[in-house]
Swiss-Prot record:
NCBIfam families, per database record: PRK04149.1, sopT
MF terms (GO), sorted A to Z: ATP binding; sulfate adenylyltransferase (ATP) activity
Alphabetized HAMAP family for the sequence: Sulf_adenylyltr
Family named by the database record: Belongs to the sulfate adenylyltransferase family.
Origin species: Staphylococcus saprophyticus subsp. saprophyticus (strain ATCC 15305 / DSM 20229 / NCIMB 8711 / NCTC 7292 / S-41)
UniProt pathway annotation: Sulfur metabolism; hydrogen sulfide biosynthesis; sulfite from sulfate: step 1/3
Catalytic activity: sulfate + ATP + H(+) = adenosine 5'-phosphosulfate + diphosphate
Any one biological process term the GO annotation gives: sulfate assimilation
The protein's name: Sulfate adenylyltransferase
Keyword Transferase (UniProt): yes
Keywords: ATP-binding, Nucleotide-binding, Nucleotidyltransferase, Transferase
InterPro entries documented for this protein: ATP-Sase_PUA-like_dom, PUA-like_sf, Rossmann-like_a/b/a_fold, SO4_adenylyltransferase_pro, Sulfurylase_cat_dom, Sulphate_adenylyltransferase
Domain of life: Bacteria
């Protein structure tokens, strides 16, 4: 979808200044489908396929393809692209050494999904090896293979392919078709709604009461809220995206103003890179048209690998460069005395009266077959989660 000059001028500037679109038109798609059978080919795992999609639709603007070695090294070591633009996570295409040896620089490489469907074409400009231990240590802050993101690093091929991509076809996301909007479409949506300021919220968990509290606090000072849940690959013990999406529908319908909230999927894989992933999440939401982004406790964290507010500390160092306003919230809790949600800034009562909420605790209770108290979750949401996980 092409944006008009008026929309471009009246929505936040994309990261790097231009909203990238690498999706081919119908004529070129037909040509690429015909010639792809004669191209060397590789099969993308779900993680790489989601990266391909986000490059193609502009979610990862200004990237036009998978990173070359110069950009990769600069991102890993200094959180910037070679051109000086802030970028925190390497977006790369790994293959085995044997596969890399079959491919020649200058070739067009057909990119298939695990369903044997053609999704894209890579114009191969570069092949390079990388240090897995270094990538893990710099990006994830640990080399412990118990960390799900680090494990992915060690499992993937030892060579990266680089070059611009063409998005030939899109993963369907059939379950979420009503909520599948590209960055150009969300920008059009915000313009049509006359939202000058929009706060984005990233989540891979159901919306519990602490989430609701900080979202509504943010909504007091902006025109609209974009609830933008990640629906790509996550850990096996995370709540399935389809169940989460139903829970989002229920809570928005019953507890949020319809004219000031929108639900749109974020079709990315979860990296669990904590502070660095918080920067990526903010960057992507800027590309989707958000002017503000919420960073709460342990953003994009897993286990005890990151401190409670490490993500807030790191992203604050790059906020001016990012060009999106970061809204930092303390850990919210339910106070039995206040009989309401609060934070340490607003509640005077002893910690023994505080019920701390988290996605982990919600998952644990559901896994153990426990009911979710009203202080934890809206009853309609709890019903959806319990039913969905029983069916799973």
């Amino acid at each position: 979808m092409a944006l008009t000059k008026e929309i471009i001028e009246n929505t936040i500037q994309p990261h790097g200044g231009t909203l990238i679109n690498r999706e081919v038109n119908a004529e070129l798609k037909e040509t690429m489908l015909e010639v792809s059978h004669s191209m060397p080919a590789i099969t993308l795992n779900p993680w790489s396929l989601s990266d391909l999609e986000l490059i193609g639709i502009g979610g990862f603007s200004p990237l036009t393809g998978f990173m070359n070695e110069a950009d990769y090294n600069e991102v890993v070591e200094n959180l910037h692209l070679k051109n000086g633009l802030v970028w925190s996570i390497p977006i790369t295409l790994p293959v085995t050494e044997d596969k890399a040896n079959e491919l020649e620089i200058g070739e067009s490489i057909a990119l298939y999904g695990e369903d044997n469907h053609l999704y894209g074409v890579l114009e191969l400009e570069e092949k390079y090896t990388y240090d897995k231990e270094k990538e893990a240590a710099f990006v994830y802050g640990t080399t412990d293979i118990e960390h799900p993101g680090v494990l992915k690093v060690y499992e993937k091929g030892s060579v990266y392919l680089a070059g611009p991509i063409h998005l030939v076809d899109r993963p369907k996301h059939d379950e979420f078709v009503d909520y599948h909007l590209d960055p150009s479409e969300t920008r059009q949506l915000f313009y049509d709604l006359n939202w000058k300021t929009v706060v984005g919220f990233q989540t891979r968990n159901p919306v519990h009461r602490a989430h609701e509290y900080i979202q509504k606090a943010a909504l007091e000072s902006v025109d609209g809220l974009l609830l933008n849940p990640l629906v790509g690959e996550t850990k096996s013990d995370d709540i399935p995206a389809a169940v989460r999406m139903e829970s989002y529908e229920v809570i928005l319908k019953n507890y949020y103003p319809e004219n000031r909230t929108r639900l749109v999927i974020y079709p990315a894989a979860m990296r669990y890179a904590g502070p660095r992933e918080a920067i990526l999440h903010a960057t992507v939401r800027k590309n989707y048209g958000c002017t503000h982004f919420i960073v709460g406790r342990d953003h994009a964290g897993v286990g005890d690998y990151y401190g409670t507010y490490d993500a807030q500390t790191l992203i604050a160092q790059y906020e001016d460069e990012l060009g999106i306003q970061i809204l930092k919230f303390e850990h919210a809790f339910y106070c039995n005395v206040c009989e309401n949600m609060a934070t340490a800034k607003t509640c005077p009562h002893d910690a023994s009266e505080h019920l701390h909420l988290s996605g982990t605790k919600v998952r644990e209770k559901l896994k153990n077959g426990e009911s979710l108290p009203k202080a934890f979750s809206r009853p309609e949401v709890a019903d959806v989660l319990i039913k969905g996980l029983q069916e799973k």
